[in-house]
Amino acid sequence: MSKNCCCKICCASAKKCCDEPVFISCREKCEPVIYKCYEICEPVCTPVCKPCKPICKPCKPICTPCKPVCKPVCKPICTPCKPICKPKCCPTYNVSVNLC
């Protein structure tokens, strides 16, 4: 294949690029050349957090006249959020270029 016939082009947007042509006719130059295009997209991230769990120390009763008073000391322990990223699917489309 000659360089004149099969060339790599880019789309208008910076985030869109074209692969090598899916179909190209070198013998019949009047047929349109079809480039398969795709978009480069950023991944979509969602934070995943675990709920906080209180961890309590056993209480020591403080005696008052008549009733022992007990208050447990609790501290919440939480796990930090970790993002889970999945690539966003982007539509592919064709660009037709006439070589005539």
Swiss-Prot record:
It comes from Acanthamoeba polyphaga mimivirus (APMV). This is Uncharacterized protein L53. The lineage of its organism: Viruses, Varidnaviria, Bamfordvirae, Nucleocytoviricota, Megaviricetes. It comes from the Viruses.
